[in-house]
Regions:
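Glycine-rich phosphate/pyrophosphate-binding beta-alpha loops
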Residues: 31-60
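Internal helix-turn-beta structural module
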Residues: 123-155
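Long, compositionally biased
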Residues: 154-169
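Conserved small/polar residues in nucleotide/adenosyl-binding loops
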Residues: 176-179
Length: 179
């Protein structure tokens, strides 16, 4: 995670040394998630990549869009909040409480997304609202059934997944506020 924070912005700007370091970071991340699995960010990205007629949502882009929302959702589970806060502390993000540290982590991810021109919402990505509404129940059901869902720190059912996707589509969510 520290390597990503250090090198991702420069890598995006075509710095070849930073890109090399990101390759190492990706390798380490791959080794980590081979043992720990991934959670619903990836479940959601798996099921939306090719789901909409407006075009393929690249897996990395989908992960980046979904991550801040999923952290907000997961952080309502105390152990998840503690672990996210620990990540924030380890990478030097501020905050006097775990809640503030988690919010700082979310803000940092959102800052990176803006710097790399990653849309904040599925609507901003270009997914048509009528198609989203037509497909969201099936996508949500499939995402809950994805193998990565079982390793998420907070359980989720299809109805809740649908509400989470709706939050991500519009970017306004009263249901999943910051922890």
């Amino acid at each position: 995670i520290e390597m990503v924070l250090d090198y991702l912005p420069q890598s995006y700007k075509c710095d070849m040394n930073a890109r090399e370091q990101m390759h190492y970071a990706q390798c380490l991340a791959g080794q980590a998630f081979s043992n720990a699995l991934l959670g619903i960010v990836h479940s959601m990205a798996h099921k939306t990549g090719a789901a909409f007629s407006t075009g393929h949502i690249p897996h990395g882009c989908a992960n980046a869009i979904y991550l801040p929302y999923v952290i907000k959702y997961n952080a309502h589970e105390p152990e998840a909040m503690h672990r996210y806060a620990d990540i924030a502390r380890r990478v030097g993000l501020g905050g006097t409480s775990e809640k503030a540290q988690v919010n700082a982590l979310i803000a940092k991810i959102e800052e990176f997304n803006r710097a790399m021109n990653i849309p904040k919402t599925l609507q901003e990505f270009g997914v048509k609202e009528d198609e989203f509404k037509e497909k969201i129940a099936t996508i949500s059901e499939n995402a809950v059934g994805d193998a990565c869902t079982g390793s998420n720190p907070r359980t989720i059912d299809p109805a809740t997944m649908e509400r989470l996707f709706t939050c991500i589509y519009y970017g306004t969510c009263l249901l999943y506020t910051s922890p």
